[in-house]
Amino acid sequence: CTFIFVSYVFSKTNNKWFDRWSCERLIKYKAVIFGSIGTIVETSNIQRKSFNKAFKEFGLDWYWSTSEYKKLLEKSGGENRLSKYANKKNIKINTKKLRDLKTKFFNDYLKKNKIKPRAGVLNIINFCKKNNIKLGFATSTTVNNINSIFFTLKNTINKKDFNFIGNNKLVLREKPYPDIYMITLKKLKIRPKECLAIEDTEESMKSALKAKIRCVAFPGKLH
């Protein structure tokens, strides 16, 4: 298996395991930046179920099927996704409160269940640590989500593995804007050409590419 580098075209053929041979190609970089939670763990279906549970408790008759949620994932931002969906349904709701409820269900699930890292992720992290390559996590999700992810991964991956971890409080604009990547570059004290980003969606890849960072596509099951 090899890394497949892309420009603005997101190819589903890029979902390959990162083996040792692939990791050795990282040696020329000063940093590797994981861009989203989905590049480390597969959570899309858990999040979909958490949304549906929140809808039910909120008194909404909404239900996101796997195929519908897959289409919704083409755009970043949970609250933004909810706002557009509510407008489509011509319903006024408190999207922040609804998203917070979904986040609670999502985090509750992660605290009670263990999730393994995606195939190859541990190889990358261990290789980078062994070769003094910095690790960044350019996520713009909530701190609660980040904490829950690392809680469920505590026996395999932890926060200390990363030199910098982003969150939604650090940026005003979500992906595909490059803001979170610009902050990550600054915190890691590196230039765009000195690092490689890994993203799981086309929308998120645009964020890295706009920051002039080379990016590899690593799509999840619903992307």
Where are these regions (language model features)?
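A generic structural motif
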Residues: 132-133, 213
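Short active-site oxyanion
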Residues: 133-136, 193-194
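N-terminal helical cap/lid subdomain that shapes the substrate entry/recognition surface
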Residues: 10-21, 25-119, 127, 131
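Asp-based, Mg2+/Mn2+-dependent phosphohydrolase catalytic module
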Residues: 8-28, 126, 142-143, 148-223
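Active-site-adjacent beta-strand anchor residues
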Residues: 41, 118, 136-140, 174, ...
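Amphipathic coiled-coil/heptad-repeat helices and related helical stalk/stem segments
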Residues: 120-121, 201
